[in-house]
Curated annotation (Swiss-Prot):
GO terms of biological process kind: L-lysine catabolic process; putrescine catabolic process
Any Pfam family: Aminotran_3
Cofactor(s) listed in the protein's UniProt record: pyridoxal 5'-phosphate
Family: Belongs to the class-III pyridoxal-phosphate-dependent aminotransferase family. Putrescine aminotransferase subfamily.
Catalytic activity: an alkane-alpha,omega-diamine + 2-oxoglutarate = an omega-aminoaldehyde + L-glutamate; putrescine + 2-oxoglutarate = 1-pyrroline + L-glutamate + H2O; cadaverine + 2-oxoglutarate = 5-aminopentanal + L-glutamate
Enzyme Commission designation: 2.6.1.82, 2.6.1.29
Keyword Cytoplasm in record: no
Binding-site list for pyridoxal 5'-phosphate: 150-151, 274, 332
Highest taxon listed in the record's lineage: Bacteria
PTM annotation (N6-(pyridoxal phosphate)lysine): residues: 300
InterPro entries: Aminotrans_3 (IPR005814), Aminotrans_3_PPA_site (IPR049704), Class-III_PLP-dep_AT (IPR050103), Putrescine_aminotransferase (IPR017747), PyrdxlP-dep_Trfase (IPR015424), PyrdxlP-dep_Trfase_major (IPR015421), PyrdxlP-dep_Trfase_small (IPR015422)
Protein name (database record): Putrescine aminotransferase
Amino acid sequence: MNRLPSSASALACSAHALNLIEKRTLDHEEMKALNREVIEYFKEHVNPGFLEYRKSVTAGGDYGAVEWQAGSLNTLVDTQGQEFIDCLGGFGIFNVGHRNPVVVSAVQNQLAKQPLHSQELLDPLRAMLAKTLAALTPGKLKYSFFCNSGTESVEAALKLAKAYQSPRGKFTFIATSGAFHGKSLGALSATAKSTFRKPFMQLLPGFRHVPFGNIEAMRTALNECKKTGDDVAAVILEPIQGEGGVILPPPGYLTAVRKLCDEFGALMILDEVQTGMGRTGKMFACEHENVQPDILCLAKALGGGVMPIGATIATEEVFSVLFDNPFLHTTTFGGNPLACAAALATINVLLEQNLPAQADQKGDMLLDGFRQLAREYPDLVQEARGKGMLMAIEFVDNEIGYNFASEMFRQRVLVAGTLNNAKTIRIEPPLTLTIEQCELVIKAARKALAAMRVSVEEA
């Protein structure tokens, strides 16, 4: 039977939600009721699949905990009042922590002035953020297009490369195996996970994938494309593959790819949606090799964990294809005043507090601890790897990784797997994580592994 629209029901539901938003605390009964509501509404109106996915972060084995608020810069609190050290970081958005006061203040101040721009008049913060990014990014990167997410940033990069290279007869893109660039149609064409690709085949034509980190495979692909007349418009890759399992390429790989792009006249697109904004110990991961891309993609942490914003930054030579008609690629909410305020404040915090250097130092501390655990538990842990505060623990099979996430949840530490590698648990905390919290995370991991070994032995 078709359900008739109900204004009364919609009004009641929205009023109830607004009442919850206004509340600072909930009593025990309110918390229980909220848990029931959230689980029901996810099942009936969002997607029941998310409930099964979130079983690993549930102490009782039912469904995922219901998040209520940020506890501190580096912790989350659920509706039961339990505080968790955040080692997931919202998949890399909380580089400056949760509700960083500088970022929140900037957004609140802008909200009091003008939340969204008129679309017709010039908006100051978009101009100032573009200028700031031109100063912050490496090489000749100069012009910025702003959007709302990482996949939009990649879409813009692909379209920009097409617009620049099409008059030159170059239409092919080379991406890498294990890559994740987003799930919109163009970005998904560059992504290399069959689970995400197969339901939407055929994707955009002209994309090839080569093994990540293998420079000879890259050279061979570029040569073959040239021989067959399928000249390459651009190579797109992540400096470190995040969703692929935090896969680091061999030293010098990015430098060698840059040289190949120059040799074959291909643009180099670096997707730093996850690795950028100080995550790996430098402001941008490409700076570890002093590599300068033609197009750089940012998002996630750019908004400081407060506002969604993405950016596609390109050299003047490449970006100039949009000068004659700036409406070739636009978005209504991209570069809005609230998002730009958040991004400007985020950059300020990263630089003022030297958070990239802190990520380098604390990342080394965490990684040393995880590698020691890998030596102590070789029957469970295959490898610990990473750079800065982007790390991964790879287990000997998928089930162990799932159990580790569950055990860490019991220890009040939030972690999760990577999208393209089920055996790998990602460690991606805020860069503001304290030394004491780093020590607590290592202790929690040791307790989790010890409990898992006992379970395996008893089985």
